[in-house]
């Protein structure tokens, strides 16, 4: 998409859009946008403003978390998986995670938010719709932020005024084809920022299922990540503080409890995305095959998180904390017949439309914003601000929860491990978790770079399979 202008087909949403019941966490809601009479009607509509696909599968294929595994019997799931891994133009349109599906579905979410906002803005009693307006603005901002993460360059304040952005529809279109100017990345981020700030002021918390909606906590986690990517590090810290409060430890996942569960079937994945887990701030229910392809099924083995990547760079790699799978609260799942080395985090459930024909829809649930990831957002922002003691405190708070014996690091531990004497920079011949940064902004070699290497290394492990690694690759020019 290198053209300055483009056409978007704003596709009308299906009248009954929504995911059907699938275990206790899938929930179908009617689309009542054609009969909006009350704030409750708008709330029901806004269920469809949360995109029903997720880029994790695509972004994991793009990122350095995935390797090509050559062995008889290990095949690609389909041509889409091969095209994504090989970084060629993706011509496939049928899987749920293709760029074309992602594009149209996220713009559908924007359209839904705009329908809600149009109705709200036409009402005499605006105050009755304050919470719905806040949620609609946050959903629009989130959809556009996610589109930017896939289809745009990483934000860089030195180039954002010339880097291409994306169209940002702010009204309901009545024509099928509307011509939009892409604008710049600076324009796009400014519009996301505006919606985010207004939405944060209005967002409510009165939902039947709050973990599936933006609340003050999940919206603040979104803001923390957004401002980190926007290179506004003070604001990233500010909003992370709103999530974590004065006792971040109390917000974090009970990794030991999760690790104690069986890695077989869907036990660990369902526990990981449970709405009862305090650390899970926003859950996203989507149509996706990633729970199978990135999971324990013998499916899509050719392009997967391999033994080499696992042992040298990620979940079995050595870090300043020790050997990761010996130190951390998880069990690496693998069997002799699989190329994959995985953590059981993404559930897979197949909803049959016709059991006899084997036709239906695969589903997954993602923990899109969590307290643990927000803590590492704050740690990274503190490091980029030069607040190394605060960054180390956050790192150690996460390590205390994530590790079996509460391992703690000193600044010297971090600097020593990510030094040339101990861990050389990655090369294809000698892979390591330490990868060279290529950023427009300066990073000091003595303390800042080792701290950032450590935070990115831990985030890569902790969020494996969730699609976030690709954003670090983009932001740091890895």
Task: List each model region and its residues.
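Membrane-proximal, proline-rich intrinsically disordered regions
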Residues: 22-69, 298, 467, 477-478
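Hydrophobic-face positions in mid-chain alpha helices that act as interaction patches
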Residues: 237-372, 405-442, 458, 462-468, ...
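Aromatic-residue-lined binding/catalytic grooves and analogous aromatic/hydrophobic interfacial grooves
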Residues: 23, 217-256
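Sec-dependent bacterial lipoprotein signal peptides
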Residues: 1-22
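Conserved, well-structured interaction surfaces
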Residues: 80-152, 183-186, 196-205, 359-366, ...
């Amino acid at each position: 998409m290198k053209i300055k202008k483009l056409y978007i087909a704003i596709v009308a949403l299906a009248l009954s859009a929504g995911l059907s019941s699938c275990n206790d966490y899938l929930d179908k809601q009617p689309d009542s946008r054609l009969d909006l009479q009350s704030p409750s009607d708008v709330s029901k509509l806004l269920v469809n403003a949360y995109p029903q696909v997720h880029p994790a599968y695509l972004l994991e294929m793009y990122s350095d978390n995935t390797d090509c595994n050559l062995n008889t019997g290990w095949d690609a799931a389909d041509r889409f998986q091969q095209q994504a891994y090989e970084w060629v133009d993706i011509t496939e349109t049928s899987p749920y995670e293709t760029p074309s599906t992602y594009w149209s579905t996220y713009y559908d979410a924007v359209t839904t938010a705009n329908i809600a906002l149009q109705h709200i803005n036409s009402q005499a009693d605006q105050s009755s719709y304050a919470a719905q307006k806040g949620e609609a603005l946050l959903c629009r901002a989130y959809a556009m932020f996610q589109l930017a993460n896939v289809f745009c360059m990483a934000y860089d304040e030195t180039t954002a005024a010339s880097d291409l952005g994306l169209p940002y529809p702010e009204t309901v279109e009545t024509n099928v084809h509307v011509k939009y100017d892409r604008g710049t990345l600076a324009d796009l981020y400014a519009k996301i920022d505006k919606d985010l700030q207004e939405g944060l002021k209005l967002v409510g918390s009165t939902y039947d299922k709050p973990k599936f909606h933006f609340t003050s906590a999940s919206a603040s986690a979104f803001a923390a990540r957004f401002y980190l990517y926007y290179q506004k590090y003070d604001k990233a810290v500010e909003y992370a503080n709103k999530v974590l409060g004065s006792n971040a430890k109390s917000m974090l996942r009970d990794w030991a409890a999760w690790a104690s569960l069986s890695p077989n079937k869907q036990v660990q994945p369902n526990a990981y995305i449970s709405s009862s887990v305090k650390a899970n701030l926003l859950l996203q229910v989507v149509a996706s095959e990633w729970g199978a392809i990135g999971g324990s099924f013998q499916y899509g083995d050719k392009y997967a998180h391999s033994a080499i990547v696992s042992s040298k760079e990620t979940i079995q790699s050595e870090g300043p904390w020790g050997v990761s799978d010996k130190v951390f609260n998880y069990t690496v799942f693998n069997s002799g017949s699989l190329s994959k080395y995985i953590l059981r985090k993404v559930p897979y459930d197949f909803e049959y439309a016709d059991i006899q024909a084997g036709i239906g829809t695969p589903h997954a649930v993602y923990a899109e914003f969590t307290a643990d990831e927000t803590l590492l957002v704050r740690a990274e922002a503190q490091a980029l601000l030069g607040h190394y003691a605060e960054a180390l405190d956050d790192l150690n708070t996460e390590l205390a929860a994530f590790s079996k014996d509460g391992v703690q690091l000193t600044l010297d531990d971090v600097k020593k491990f990510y030094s040339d004497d101990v861990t050389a920079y990655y090369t294809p011949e000698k892979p390591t978790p330490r990868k060279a940064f290529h950023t427009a902004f300066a990073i000091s070699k003595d303390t800042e770079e080792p701290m950032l290497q450590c935070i990115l290394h831990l985030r890569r492990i902790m969020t494996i399979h969730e699609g976030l690694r690709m954003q670090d690759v983009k932001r740091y020019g890895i």
